[in-house]
Curated annotation (Swiss-Prot):
Biological role stated in the UniProt entry: Catalyzes the interconversion of 2-phosphoglycerate and 3-phosphoglycerate.
Gene that encodes it: gpmI
Biological processes, Gene Ontology terms: glucose catabolic process; glycolytic process
Keyword list, A-Z: Glycolysis, Isomerase, Manganese, Metal-binding
Pfam family, one: iPGM_N
Family: Belongs to the BPG-independent phosphoglycerate mutase family.
Protein name stated in the entry: 2,3-bisphosphoglycerate-independent phosphoglycerate mutase
Manganese in keyword set: yes
Residues the record lists as binding Mn(2+) 1: 399, 403, 459
Cofactors (names): Mn(2+)
Amino acid sequence: MTATPKPLVLIILDGFGHSESHEGNAILAAKMPVMDRLYETMPNGLISGSGMDVGLPDGQMGNSEVGHMNLGAGRVVYQDFTRVTKAIRDGEFFENPTICAAVDKAVGAGKAVHIMGLLSDGGVHSHQGHLVAMAELAVKRGAEKIYLHAFLDGRDTPPRSAKKSLELMDATFARLGKGRTATIIGRYFAMDRDNRWDRVSTAYNLIVDSTAEFHADSGVAGLEAAYARDENDEFVKATRIGEPARVEDGDAVVFMNFRADRARELTRVFVEDDFKDFERARQPKVNYVMLTQYAASIPAPSAFAAGSLKNVLGEYLADNGKTQLRIAETEKYAHVTFFFSGGREEPFPGEERILIPSPKVATYDLQPEMSAPEVTDKIVDAIEHQRYDVIIVNYANGDMVGHSGIMEAAIKAVECLDVCVGRITAALEKVGGEALITADHGNVEQMTDDSTGQAHTAHTSEPVPFVYVGKRPLKVREGGVLADVAPTMLHLLGMEKPQEMTGHSILVAK
């Protein structure tokens, strides 16, 4: 008979980085008695969640997708951002068979090439350099009509920073002698991931039919008009630039976001014949390309196929007869399931999942606690009943409220997290369980931008905390990275790590 599991809980505080600076630091400004006590009494340190340590370009801030891939894989995962950038640099991008086939088909029929994606240098969902390369590819393949549908950022970049990006694309089209910006809209509409189809329909109708509340002669003019309406980049309303550039049958549409979670919904509207979440006025039959595979179930080709990861933590636990729970609210559910499992949609044997709906508010500063208390209720219940060997939870608050740029809300968010962590650690103490507390990347520790004085709404490259909660005589070694977390969990579970995991336990004997 097997012993009753005493769970090992991995608590991922999304967007919860470490900074010594008090300026705009919601964590240091908050009252967090539980975390303060854990830092004083439990083995803890800092680990890296950015740049080359997570498979991103040197100096690039981490993000939730990348962070969870590394956390679950137990090895540094070469990221799509890096793959695409390298392909452009090596020239392979311009021969990519999937993109070239779609463009050539459109060009051969005298049709247009539509390039859409997040236009910024944020590097989280996309990079403007990739959109420049796509425009160059279209011209090289003979396209005469090239239209850019620009989604504006202001979330992974400063709130009002899109002008330079729009000017870059204008300069690119001028240099190439072809192409223009056709529409601009904030990512709030085009890149929803919470089934808010009213937002997505606004973006779809703008791109497909040039249906827009506002018109402007240039992207920059449209942006300045939005600022005059007090709309930051993220929230810029549907704006048509110049003459209508509708999407017609036979056109090529290339979505240049490399990150999947905020590209799925708009993609589904374009390509799913049985799409029912809102009524499309038209569904043009286009040659659609996803830059990467946004979901296996989406009926469209991807330019960069997903690489498979063998023996990620979830798979290895399942193969060794261990049970696991994955739990998060809507905003981060994909991260604690799909991304943590190395890009796999289906649960592993013995893996259960709980999705708690995120609150239906326009922005999460209006409800900084989000659904964290409800998530915690489920975890405490699972711990008390000792249902699982391993529980993996994501708390979205630090990241989602951090993105609002509103300090007071961010303080409330992290104070709520402190209460939740306290409830989990108290429940674990009763049953003899253990926990690891960490984060996927920074955000909420920097709510103001020192250089501009604007709200800081983006992620950071700061290290993230790593705390062991338990009774073993252990200490945290120096130099840990996110890829070391899964091997650390296996170490605590008394399991050998698989050879595919190149990370090393962060915990060593005292």
